[in-house]
A protein has these predicted regions:
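Cytosolic nucleotide-binding catalytic cores of signal-transduction proteins
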Residues: 32-35, 142, 146, 167
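C-terminal peripheral helix-coil segments that are non-catalytic and often amphipathic
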Residues: 4-7, 164-190
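Helical hydrophobic small-molecule/effector-binding pocket
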Residues: 89-127, 131
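Basic, helix-initiating cap at the start of DNA-binding domains
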Residues: 2-35
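Helix-turn-helix
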Residues: 31-65
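Alpha-helical structural segments
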Residues: 22-30, 48, 65-84, 94, ...
Length: 190
């Protein structure tokens, strides 16, 4: 998205490219909320985004590349919001609270991009990203099965609670319960 401005000798962000990307992404999310990824036609997406097919293909290889890009952005945003939590030593209570809040803040995008059979992919990618962060902070993390299991328990359990119990319990009580369970699991594991 950065283009060389030869007249001024500097770099500038081409606002038209950014606006086109936003229009395509918005149209994609609207269509994706109504149908599976495999059913979305580029023709329909372009009509909704008010762009030509050639414009779409100048930005993305195909519909899957667009979906992957949006998934990657969402995962990165969630991981960035959780990275403020000190992950080593694994503070399961704080991690669980922040993860749940990040899931809630991104609920619409999570439910659209990772619907149906893609739900497991989402939780696994979050876990993988956290595992990589923890290993960078402490290389011994990768070879510690107890901490790895504890991380899996926190991420997968938190996501399960988010997807299956968010409507049954108010957010504060659910987050408090998850934090209590995570704290107890940490005591058992360590």
């Amino acid at each position: 998205d950065i283009r060389q401005n030869t007249e001024r000798g500097g770099l500038f962000l081409d606002i038209r490219i950014e606006k086109t990307d936003r229009a395509i992404e918005k149209a994609f999310l609207e269509l994706r909320s109504k149908m599976p990824l495999e059913k979305i036609k580029i023709k329909d997406l372009c009509a909704l985004a008010c762009v030509n097919k050639s414009t779409f293909y100048a930005h993305y290889e195909d519909i899957y590349a667009l979906s992957n890009r949006l998934e990657d952005k969402l995962i990165a945003d969630i991981l960035a919001s959780v990275s403020a939590v000190e992950l080593y030593p694994v503070r399961t209570e704080a991690l669980t609270r922040e993860l749940f809040r990040a899931f809630v803040q991104n609920k619409t995008a999570v439910n659209i991009l990772f619907a149906d059979s893609r739900q497991g992919i989402f939780a696994n990618r979050i876990e993988k990203g956290l595992r990589e962060s923890l290993t960078v902070q402490d290389p011994t993390f990768a070879n510690d099965p107890k901490r790895g299991i504890l991380l899996s328990f926190c991420v997968q359990g938190c996501f399960y609670a988010f997807t299956n119990n968010s409507s049954r319990m108010d957010e504060k009580h659910l987050v408090d319960l998850l934090a209590e369970i995570a704290r107890a699991a940490q005591k058992v594991m360590m």
